[in-house]
Amino acid sequence: MKLGRATLALLLLVPCVVRAVEPISLGLALAGVLTGYISYPRLYCLFAECCGQKRSLSREALQKDLDNKLFGQHLAKRVILNAVSGFLSNPKPKKPLTLSLHGWTGTGKNFASKIIAENIYEGGLNSDYVHLFVATLHFPHASNITLYKDQLQMWIRGNVSACARSIFIFDEMDKMHAGLIDAIKPFLDYYDVVDEVSYQKAIFIFLSNAGAERITDVALDFWRSGKQREEIKLRDMEHALAVSVFNNKNSGFWHSSLIDRNLIDYFVPFLPLEYKHLKMCIRVEMQSRGYEEDEDIINKVAEEMTFFPKEEKVFSDKGCKTVFTKLDYYLDD
């Protein structure tokens, strides 16, 4: 809650006061308005962000955002749509929703978490109820892991106490110190209450490059077999992805109890992007900047990117991550 914004809204509700009104009368009137204002959450939420959904999550709106903004990720789109909409429609979930998004840089993991946040809170990632942790920024020193565990537990407990529908996003899980993330295990388990706080309506999203090699191997096998990437099913890689991440010493999930105790609801693979997907990213970026689509520029930017494997050159090295800066060069030309 932003007190200044709420107070300003209150003052707007109070009629202009003529000079004849005594200060005490004005104070009583304002107190009455305050009492009534606070008594009606719906009225309050017209002027300040509230915990929970300001509006009911629209499955159709979420699907539209995923279809229009996330390219080449049929598996991720399906899992996110069903998992998030299903979880939010359940009035009494047994545990928090936990999604672990895996794939190379630039494939859309951060963008997907942004879409989820924006469809739950109007403020999106800037909402008071959405919390982003970046491993290299917030947990840089291995020697402080005990301190980080205590701080992480306190932060999550405090924020869920204030808002049951809090969203926590952990970026760079592949760079997080092993064992640190296990500090939040009690909050993800099947407990109704932990230290007088219920975490069952919270959402935890983990982003990682770990397991990207396994995802690429499956995608490349399908390509070499002449199959469409859309034929890849979640069952083709989810279990192998979980095992790969669990056994990866460079992953924050290395031998993690979150995986061992099956507390991650979905391991979501983000496939490496092909040339056609880069063109989609460039086209949408041009539209968002107010430019007309220019196929010549779109092709030039896409051709600037590098691809792998070295022989076949099927997948983009950096996904869509750097196409935006490449686009700047051609738009200014």
Curated annotation (Swiss-Prot):
Cellular component, GO annotation: cytoplasm; cytoplasmic vesicle membrane; endoplasmic reticulum; endoplasmic reticulum lumen; endoplasmic reticulum membrane; growth cone; membrane; nuclear envelope
Ranges annotated as spanning the membrane: none
PTM annotation: N-glycosylated.
Gene Ontology MF terms in the entry: ATP binding; ATP hydrolysis activity; ATP-dependent protein folding chaperone; cytoskeletal protein binding; identical protein binding; kinesin binding; misfolded protein binding
Described function: Protein with chaperone functions important for the control of protein folding, processing, stability and localization as well as for the reduction of misfolded protein aggregates. Involved in the regulation of synaptic vesicle recycling, controls STON2 protein stability in collaboration with the COP9 signalosome complex (CSN). In the nucleus, may link the cytoskeleton with the nuclear envelope, this mechanism seems to be crucial for the control of nuclear polarity, cell movement and, specifically in neurons, nuclear envelope integrity.
Assembly and oligomerization: Homohexamer. Interacts with TOR1B; the interaction may be specific of neural tissues. Interacts (ATP-bound) with TOR1AIP1 and TOR1AIP2; the interactions induce ATPase activity. Interacts with KLHL14; preferentially when ATP-free. Interacts with KLC1 (via TPR repeats); the interaction associates TOR1A with the kinesin oligomeric complex. Interacts with COPS4; the interaction associates TOR1A with the CSN complex. Interacts with SNAPIN; the interaction is direct and associates SNAPIN with the CSN complex. Interacts with STON2.
Protein name: Torsin-1A
Organism the protein comes from: Rattus norvegicus
Top-level taxonomy: Eukaryota, Metazoa, Chordata, Craniata, Vertebrata
